[in-house]
Each structure stands twice: as C-alpha cells, then as structure tokens.
Amino acid sequence: MTPEHLPTEQYEAQLAEKVVRLQSMMAPFSDLVPEVFRSPVSHYRMRAEFRIWHDGDDLYHIIFDQQTKSRIRVDSFPAASELINQLMTAMIAGVRNNPVLRHKLFQIDYLTTLSNQAVVSLLYHKKLDDEWRQQAEVLRDALRAQNLNVHLIGRATKTKIELDQDYIDERLPVAGREMIYRQVENSFTQPNAAMNIQMLEWALDVTKDSKGDLLELYCGNGNFSLALARNFDRVLATEIAKPSVAAAQYNIAANHIDNVQIIRMAAEEFTQAMNGVREFNRLQGIDLKSYQCETIFVDPPRSGLDSETEKMVQAYPRILYISCNPETLCKNLETLSQTHKVERLALFDQFPYTHHMECGVLLTAK
C-alpha cells in the first residue's frame, strides 16, 4: 500500500487474514467464529495528519515511511474522506503563494464528518499574530466560497487561534435514530465513521436485554454511552480529558438524553472511589451506591486494562469490551476468563490494509 494507492483488490484477502488471526488469538478463551464487520474499501478515514514539506517554491503534504523513515509526497489520500481530499488540494493552493500563511508551516491536521463539516488545523514553528489571523480569514472565506464547510485553527507553541470554533458536529444514523456527536479538534474521535456506526449498533444488539444500569470507563465524547443509554435505566461514565467531557455534556443535551451522568476522573481513581479507598470532591452529589450497574463497558487505550481495573470489572455480571489491540485484550482475558466467559465476539475492520484490527467481546459471569 502507498498513500496514493489502496490495494482495494486485496480487501477480501486482508480481511480474511484478520479473521483467522483473531480466531487464533482468541482460541484459549473461546471457539466462537467472529461476527465480521467490513469497512468501506476507500474514503473511510475521517481524520488525517500530514507534515508539510517546503521544496523551493513548491509546498506539499508528506508522510514518513514507517520502515525507512523516508519522505513520501502525498497529493491525494484515498484512505481519507472525500472532503479531506478536496481540502488537501484547496489548502495547498491557498497557502503556497501566501508568505504569511506559508512561513514556518510544518503540519496540517484534518478532521471531517459524514455530515460534511471540517476543522483544519495549521501548525507553525513561529508566533502567530493579527496578520496571520487576517490572512487565515481570507483563506477560510475562499474555501467557503468553494462550498467547503470548514473552520480553521492556527497552532504554535502555547498558542491556539480559532477563527470561529474548534469543533464540528457529526450526525450518525444508529439503529433507527440520528445521534449528534460534537467532535473537538485535537481530541480523540473514532477515525472510521462507517465502522463506528457498526460498532455502536453491535453494542446495542449485544446489550438489548439488559437490566439495571451501565458503567462506562474511558467514555471520550460519549460515543458509546449515549448510544447505549436507550438499553439501560441509567448510565454512569468516566473520562479524564476536559475537552472530551465538555463535548460529552453537549452531546447529552443535543440528543435529549436524561439518564447519562459523566464524571471527570481517571479509571484508576474511579476504582478507588467505588472501593471506598478515597473520597473525591468531584463525586459530591452523586450517590454511587444508588447505581445498580449490571454491565460495565470498557474501551481502553492500546495498553488495555491495568490490573486494578481488571479486578474491578470482574465484579460485574456482564463486561462489554471494545479493543483496538487484541494482544492486550487477550492479556486481560487471561484474568477475566477466570470469572467470565465469552458470549459474543466481533471483528471490526477499523484499519483496512494494515496489521491493526478492532474487536469487541461480551463477557458474562460464569
């Protein structure tokens, strides 16, 4: 695979290899055949980051080859959304001959939605001033004149200039309902929107007969907790990143959901609070003992669950675990399988044409 060529003719083969690999990894814990969810074969990534290379009068996006570290020029990127591809061309055209916008520009980040909105961040090795803002506003207006619904942001050391706003609102059809998700620049969002819809619908399906409340750790902007709220009496969710918590609170209101409570704290701190080890001011007014959480949902970082959180989740009758790294999932399952068994297993082809895969398991207490 090269940045400008996707081997779409190999899509089925690479997906089949992942299915075999996941089954092999899961063999010690389950003999289930994974439910398989396919990605679009192109234009599936909703965000992308590129370094900018200055080559005489020319200017272009580059990425670095992971093996050789050599530069690769990228003028189009079929893995990314069609809107990102349009913006890549338009941004280079708008910046190349503008000394103020071009000088010491070293990176451009793109974030887009299926609802055709975009935030583009320009990163600089220099101070940004009023002249930069004025020129950026001219560029933004020119982009909008091309029917590109875009917001521009300038970033430099200890500086962030928003021309309008630093977020966009995604709208996803999820099991018959439209869900609104505010996505903030420089915060985590699911990279493959089509796959995100399938993950949300799978999570809804595996929890459809749920009783009691749901606890979610690492909730981000509320992606899963808000979609799953319809299957539970109440949802209690934790997240550590301030911008994600603010986005989650907005999303609760935008989706008219009244049974979700978001707490800003790390999973490790929440474990201490649940076990009565420590008290936290942030939990004032929240009666943890009133929650009857029969199900816990975890979507941890690539490193998986730490040992304390492993112990905590084992206390719940049902564990829904979404993993972006099956190796750490399997490491966690060495512990979790002592008390729980795998009831459902899914493979989500979040990252086509790469070694990476995303998977989901539903575990129930033995």
UniProtKB/Swiss-Prot annotation:
Positions annotated as active site in the UniProt record: 324, 358
List of residues binding S-adenosyl-L-methionine: 190, 218, 223, 239, 299
Annotated keywords: Methyltransferase, S-adenosyl-L-methionine, Transferase, tRNA processing
Reactions performed catalytically: uridine(54) in tRNA + S-adenosyl-L-methionine = 5-methyluridine(54) in tRNA + S-adenosyl-L-homocysteine + H(+); uridine(341) in tmRNA + S-adenosyl-L-methionine = 5-methyluridine(341) in tmRNA + S-adenosyl-L-homocysteine + H(+)
The keyword tRNA processing is annotated on this UniProt entry: yes
Domain of life, per lineage: Bacteria
UniProt GO BP: tRNA methylation
PROSITE patterns: SAM_MT_RNA_M5U, TRMA_1, TRMA_2
GO molecular function: rRNA binding; tRNA (uracil(54)-C5)-methyltransferase activity, S-adenosyl methionine-dependent; tRNA binding
GO cellular component: cytosol
This enzyme's EC code(s): 2.1.1.-, 2.1.1.35
Gene3D superfamilies: 2.40.50.1070, Vaccinia Virus protein VP39
Homology family: Belongs to the class I-like SAM-binding methyltransferase superfamily. RNA M5U methyltransferase family. TrmA subfamily.
NCBIfam families linked: trmA_only
Function: Dual-specificity methyltransferase that catalyzes the formation of 5-methyluridine at position 54 (m5U54) in all tRNAs, and that of position 341 (m5U341) in tmRNA (transfer-mRNA).
Name of the protein in question: tRNA/tmRNA (uracil-C(5))-methyltransferase
